[in-house]
UniProtKB/Swiss-Prot annotation:
This is Basic leucine zipper transcriptional factor ATF-like. Residues 27-90 form the bZIP domain. PANTHER family: BASIC LEUCINE ZIPPER TRANSCRIPTIONAL FACTOR ATF-LIKE, FOS TRANSCRIPTION FACTOR-RELATED. Keywords: Activator, Cytoplasm, Differentiation, DNA-binding, Nucleus, Repressor, Transcription, Transcription regulation. Belongs to the bZIP family. It comes from Xenopus tropicalis (Western clawed frog). It is found in: Nucleus; Cytoplasm. The gene is batf. One of its GO terms (molecular function) is DNA-binding transcription factor activity.
Amino acid sequence: MQQEPDRNEQGYCSSPPSSNKQDSSDDTKKIQRREKNRIAAQKSRQRQTQKADSLHIESENLERLNSALRGEISGLREELKYLTCVLSTHQPVCVLGPTKPQAILPHVGSTRYQH
């Protein structure tokens, strides 16, 4: 005569008895792993936020520097216009006679000084 497997009230076969200590140890390890993972994820999010903040600050600083440099370029262009005008006004009345720009400003036209 064959022995029938143990059945619970719903008619399912019961699983073989398991060690409560093993389950408890596995649960503890799961909880510890989840906690460790949660902390690692939190640190990762903090680093990501700090990096984004740092990039934002750097971007703002570069924008300010860019604006200042554009202002300086604008000022230098205005000064160039003014000096060109002064020179063109002075040339007709200059007693020294016509001179080549290279004699006055040797670096003008030289590729060595161009940026």
